């Protein structure tokens, strides 16, 4: 082997790894695992034991694998759509860097490995709920809903709201009202989050042919929906306190964060600009992350 070929071999392996890793949509999956982790922690009274921390780590790994599998399958199905959108044209499937067979095999391998981890080392309920979430996102949302209805985000948001339920089930072996409240919060958060993105990426979505709300119903109608959903979300975010899951620490954080989200949505409704829509979208990510972090702090402080 020549020196040149020897030096390029590691680069080729690294490049191929990066391509497969990109299929898993790492930043999205990180938020999914974080929300699942919050569900795990809240399910355990007091500080978890060493054994429970290990159990959480294994559960997070299994959920990460299946979530990555769903993301990869989404990239496979939407590769031609992704190629027409500036936001997603860089994905390996859209650029033709990975074949359909490679992507499908990678998705299947991750799903199988994650399901096996959850079934063997966590519990059967978590495995089945996680697999159902995979089907909900990869098949029902990606294949059925997204290309057919502007309400795709609303209906399909159920699969994206599942992580706290998965986390809770992984620690308790059942599903109670508490994780369903967390499910409701993410379910209500999803439409204004994605519609804010769709507003300033509307031309991308128009080129893609996807029936996103700004494309089918226009900018003004979508802005109103963002505003209305943030009001409903505000009420939903109070539920952990009302139900007794949290104390005033979480309540104070929820009020501040939801007021901020509503303020962004109101400004967006009154005086639209792409820059403001982008800020609203970014704040929605901060909102959910800090909201769940506040739940975590509240759980340990009081």
Swiss-Prot record:
The keyword Protein biosynthesis appears for this protein: no
Membrane topology listed for this record: Multi-pass membrane protein
Main localisation: membrane
Domain of life: Bacteria
Pfam families given in the database record: UbiA
Transmembrane portions of the chain: 28-48, 53-73, 116-136, 153-173, 180-200, 226-246, 248-268, 281-301
Pathway listed: Porphyrin-containing compound metabolism; heme O biosynthesis; heme O from protoheme: step 1/1
CDD domains: PT_UbiA_Cox10 (cd13957)
Single GO MF descriptor: protoheme IX farnesyltransferase activity
Keywords assigned by UniProt, alphabetized: Cell inner membrane, Cell membrane, Heme biosynthesis, Membrane, Transferase, Transmembrane, Transmembrane helix
A biological process term (GO) from this entry: heme O biosynthetic process
Protein's UniProt keywords contain Ligase: no
Described function: Converts heme B (protoheme IX) to heme O by substitution of the vinyl group on carbon 2 of heme B porphyrin ring with a hydroxyethyl farnesyl side group.
Note: Carbon 2 of the heme B porphyrin ring is defined according to the Fischer nomenclature.
Family: Belongs to the UbiA prenyltransferase family. Protoheme IX farnesyltransferase subfamily.
Protein name: Protoheme IX farnesyltransferase
Gene field: ctaB
């Amino acid at each position: 082997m020549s020196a040149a070929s020897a030096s390029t071999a590691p680069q080729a392996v690294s490049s191929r790894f990066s391509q497969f890793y990109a299929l898993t949509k790492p930043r999205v999956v990180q938020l999914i695992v974080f929300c699942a982790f919050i569900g795990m922690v809240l399910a355990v009274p007091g500080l978890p034991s060493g054994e429970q921390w290990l159990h959480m780590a294994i559960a997070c790994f299994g959920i990460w694998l299946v979530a990555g599998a769903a993301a990869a399958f989404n990239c496979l199905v939407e590769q031609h759509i992704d190629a027409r959108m500036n936001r997603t044209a860089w994905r390996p499937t859209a650029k033709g860097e990975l074949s359909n067979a490679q992507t499908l095999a990678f998705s299947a391998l991750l799903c199988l490995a994650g399901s096996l981890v959850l079934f063997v080392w966590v519990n059967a309920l978590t495995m089945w709920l996680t697999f159902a979430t995979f089907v909900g996102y990869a098949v029902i949302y990606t294949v059925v809903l997204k290309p057919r209805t502007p309400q795709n985000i609303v209906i399909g948001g159920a699969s994206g709201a599942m992580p706290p339920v998965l986390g809770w089930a992984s620690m308790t072996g059942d599903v109670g009202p508490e994780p369903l409240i967390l499910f409701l919060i993410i379910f209500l958060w999803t439409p204004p989050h994605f519609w804010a993105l769709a507003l300033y990426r509307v031309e991308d979505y128009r080129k893609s042919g996807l029936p996103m709300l700004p494309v089918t119903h226009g900018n003004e109608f979508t802005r109103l929906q963002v505003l209305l959903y943030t009001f409903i979300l505000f009420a939903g975010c109070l539920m952990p306190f009302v139900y007794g899951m949290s104390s005033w620490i979480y309540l104070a954080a929820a009020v501040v964060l939801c007021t901020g989200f509503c303020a962004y949505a109101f400004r967006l409704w009154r005086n639209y600009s792409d820059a403001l829509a982008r800020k609203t979208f970014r704040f929605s990510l901060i909102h959910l992350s800090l909201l769940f972090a506040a739940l975590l702090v509240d759980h340990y402080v009081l």
